[in-house]
Amino acid sequence: NNPPCCSGYVCEGVYCAVDV
């Protein structure tokens, strides 16, 4: 399952990356 993306992050694959 993909992790929930918190505010300030964006889903990228199976993890969340910082949305710059």
From Swiss-Prot:
<dbReference type="GO" id="GO:0005576">
    <property type="term" value="C:extracellular region"/>
</dbReference>
<dbReference type="GO" id="GO:0090729">
    <property type="term" value="F:toxin activity"/>
</dbReference>
<keyword id="KW-1015">Disulfide bond</keyword>
<keyword id="KW-0800">Toxin</keyword>
<protein>
    <recommendedName>
        <fullName>Conotoxin TsMEKL-02</fullName>
    </recommendedName>
</protein>
<keyword id="KW-0964">Secreted</keyword>
<keyword id="KW-0528">Neurotoxin</keyword>
